[in-house]
Amino acid sequence: MSTLYVSPHPDAFPSLRALIAARYGEAGEGPGWGGAHPRICLQPPPTSRTPFPPPRLPALEQGPGGLWVWGATAVAQLLWPAGLGGPGGSRAAVLVQQWVSYADTELIPAACGATLPALGLRSSAQDPQAVLGALGRALSPLEEWLRLHTYLAGEAPTLADLAAVTALLLPFRYVLDPPARRIWNNVTRWFVTCVRQPEFRAVLGEVVLYSGARPLSHQPGPEAPALPKTAAQLKKEAKKREKLEKFQQKQKIQQQQPPPGEKKPKPEKREKRDPGVITYDLPTPPGEKKDVSGPMPDSYSPRYVEAAWYPWWEQQGFFKPEYGRPNVSAANPRGVFMMCIPPPNVTGSLHLGHALTNAIQDSLTRWHRMRGETTLWNPGCDHAGIATQVVVEKKLWREQGLSRHQLGREAFLQEVWKWKEEKGDRIYHQLKKLGSSLDWDRACFTMDPKLSAAVTEAFVRLHEEGIIYRSTRLVNWSCTLNSAISDIEVDKKELTGRTLLSVPGYKEKVEFGVLVSFAYKVQGSDSDEEVVVATTRIETMLGDVAVAVHPKDTRYQHLKGKNVIHPFLSRSLPIVFDEFVDMDFGTGAVKITPAHDQNDYEVGQRHGLEAISIMDSRGALINVPPPFLGLPRFEARKAVLVALKERGLFRGIEDNPMVVPLCNRSKDVVEPLLRPQWYVRCGEMAQAASAAVTRGDLRILPEAHQRTWHAWMDNIREWCISRQLWWGHRIPAYFVTVSDPAVPPGEDPDGRYWVSGRNEAEAREKAAKEFGVSPDKISLQQDEDVLDTWFSSGLFPLSILGWPNQSEDLSVFYPGTLLETGHDILFFWVARMVMLGLKLTGRLPFREVYLHAIVRDAHGRKMSKSLGNVIDPLDVIYGISLQGLHNQLLNSNLDPSEVEKAKEGQKADFPAGIPECGTDALRFGLCAYMSQGRDINLDVNRILGYRHFCNKLWNATKFALRGLGKGFVPSPTSQPGGHESLVDRWIRSRLTEAVRLSNQGFQAYDFPAVTTAQYSFWLYELCDVYLECLKPVLNGVDQVAAECARQTLYTCLDVGLRLLSPFMPFVTEELFQRLPRRMPQAPPSLCVTPYPEPSECSWKDPEAEAALELALSITRAVRSLRADYNLTRIRPDCFLEVADEATGALASAVSGYVQALASAGVVAVLALGAPAPQGCAVALASDRCSIHLQLQGLVDPARELGKLQAKRVEAQRQAQRLRERRAASGYPVKVPLEVQEADEAKLQQTEAELRKVDEAIALFQKML
């Protein structure tokens, strides 16, 4: 057994890191050594057993005599190997290592330095402003990184997040008050997101952020008896309070300004600027091409850019598979791509989860279309049986005071169709605003005649084969809806004990989460013997038909063949012996109610027990004696409890953790009821679906979901497909009555008396044949019920293409290429499409399934209207005020109490509303968030960063068009002319890599890889490097070099915009239309222009990349030195010292680029062995090149020396204090281990700072 030794101190951050890692290891694949999870020990290990003196915490012992590991980093890695982010050397793994190191060396010293003195755990002679400045400098890289990232390495917590969060626990608990947290907004958002994850909460509990009122003393650990304080201690505390008040005053000042010498982050400046609203006002009739002949606006405006393009695309037929070919059946060597949309419910509007689905599907569709494939993305909408009926019923009651029963079936259905026509277009409007390249001429609604015919055909065929059948079984029943509901429509509410819940139809709340015990008297017992049973649903005891005990339970062996007496009914209940009973739970005896519990039903089947239903469809009691007859079920609960007490049979009540099933539409408590329903036999179809994945005929990605697929298919149950609703596909089955005395009347559960038919005439002929009578003796009554919505949805890939008719679309596009959807409906929708498709056509409906993660809010919470975190994509596109968000809640169906709760949630998450981000930024951001995990914690505010990216594209293209000039003519091909400069070759090489990564990522459904490649190319390579190096070339006298640069620049724009187009269709179309064309016959729109292929862009150039890598390394070093010496407005000369002639030649070749990129003066390469000029600061660019930056004459050496000497004295004093503190008697024993580690890290940091100061002093002394 392995043991994890940790500190009991509540703020021991190294131990907390290990404990959280252990939690993640439990939830994942387990510890790195493959053994059992370790036991936790809240004390140091015995020194006699550890290989490292003194004992350090956390420490991990892998069994007696096994491997010992100590230290937070090593222990956490071993407990949670998956937290490393991937295999060594991968991008994620490198990022994890980087941030873990940063947390250990930068965050922990800064956090302790800022927090411990304030808590009185360490004295500090430093100015509190300087202490907070050090913390601010440590937080700055985090703040900038987290501006565009949810977590430090990927889209889920890793060991990097564990290390950084635990390092910052002290500041967030005791130092960073609300004003400070607003300064570090991104860090705060990330910190709160992390500590709300279940694994963090299990260890940390509820993390309370510092409110501004700090305790005067900090109690680190269990409370101890207070000792009398001496006069000296009281005097010392008074001084502490005085210093604390001064510290807090200075802290408030500090929080309003950046740390000394530090600039405000540029993104903050950009976010504070009001970009204004620029609109496109030229008169353009819908469907006509947008006029882009005028000048480009000064800055990017989503409303300007997105205007007019979509109607033109639609009018031109770019989204139709017929575009560019005579018909869809025409042979296409590039292949066919077909995908159908997961049909959204017609009930309302799309949210950000739908927007994620849409962004992924449209980017894939546009990529396939640009590759020249015959492409169809088919739109559609689902009638959403229960959801729609509930919404319209509420509307009807609110506006007319009528129920659907008062209105009647036909009139009610007319109201639903009317509502559908009024509201149904909103979803399609949203989809179009999202840029969805759907073929709208093929749009379908699941209640359309074409799709309804397919539903009827499927039901009739399956019924004729015996796959669909009629049976009486237990179903999930909503008494409020008066209908059976599917498993996906049942929410599971977990209770820890006694809880009062609101139930529709009851004025008072109902008690749940308790276990009631009562006694059944044994029949014929002379000793008044009884059997005690317990239940959470005491009202169901009126339906009890037996008591069950385990066959091996010795306590009840003497009761074999005996009965117990029901106290309220004239029947005795047999005592049955069944192995399902848990002997160790309660008394080991269980009441059996087959008509109201699934386990009891199965016991009843095994023992031939009667199933007595005691509730009608509305939840009122039936088949019971007065006074219980007719009582609502939860009124009966109280009445039964009173009656048991009156008869002396009540034995107790206790809290009981339980799960209450709730209907997610009506919020009613779901009851298991016996009802005759229609079922689908799924066994053989499930085996075929499972085998298709095993053989590889059907690929499910990510592959981790295949295990879930097989588990569901191997354990599938019969599918109940009937619903007691009016809105939906009415079941094409008819109950038969035969007007012939020779034929006895039938009963509902008897399947022989039910026939199906495509119409009533066909059903009548079937019935006449079945009973051997003439059709005129047959009376038919069609079933009032409708089919489960998932049944018609399961036929969607077939029905939209015209099945069962052999249409042209069916022959070309079935089976489809891909089904893309969220992993949460893998069983409810995907599995049923596969089963029905295979059964009805003998072919799979699609060849691949890609399952994306589920969108949650920035705090990891499920999207819920009552939390106020359900966001309309259009509100992100256009922006909305906080009041606007509130107004949406007022117009919803939420209860007033839920509205107030949702308002608070909106106020917390969007205090200033949601800024206008635009469609392109939203789509790109959602795809960038994608990871092959199960959840995405989406921070809407992060989308704004991608609007800034759009602005960068805009400005870069605007600059490029000026550089190209009005008379520029692109060369006929994109191939280089042979006279390109080093930086021209480099950017082409980087463009080649972006093209390779983009195509590779699309093929692998690795959307973050695609977005990262494109973002990096445009922002970090084209804008930050190439355009800067281009400026002197375009303004120079070398016309050959300038022309080569212009052709290369044009190629970068042309290829770069095509790369981005699937994600950002609007801004790329706008910019593309402003570029000159290589050929007059080029496609009219970017969306039908060929996507860049590696074969087209094969310009990989390792030599140029090595040269520019040296240039960029030198540039980074020069920029760092300029920042150190505050030379932001001066262009200092730079001298490069190289180790060999090859490096010298390379440095000489890139010196001009360094001059442009680093804003340097002269950039010269020193001869081998030549000394650098006096008065230079030195930095390393690589192991073969050093930079000497000329400071002589640019700074005042005497003044700088004075500042450095003072800094040196303070650093020496601080180092000496730390050495004395660590050398003090009892330090290893009395001081907490985490404080010792922080002191050690602080000493190392201070000594490194001293060495740097000494080097600077030596430099400036030479300059005097």
From Swiss-Prot:
Residues annotated for ATP binding in this entry: 865
Sequence motif: 'HIGH' region, positions: 344-354
Residue numbers carrying Phosphoserine: 437, 527
Record's protein name: Valine--tRNA ligase
PANTHER family referenced in this protein's UniProt entry, alphabetically: VALINE--TRNA LIGASE, VALYL-TRNA SYNTHETASES
One GO location term (cellular component): endoplasmic reticulum
Biased composition (Basic and acidic residues): 234-248, 261-275
Similarity comment: Belongs to the class-I aminoacyl-tRNA synthetase family.
Motif stretch ('KMSKS' region): 862-866
Domain of life of the source: Eukaryota
Record SUPFAM superfamilies: Anticodon-binding domain of a subclass of class I aminoacyl-tRNA synthetases, GST C-terminal domain-like, Nucleotidylyl transferase, ValRS/IleRS/LeuRS editing domain
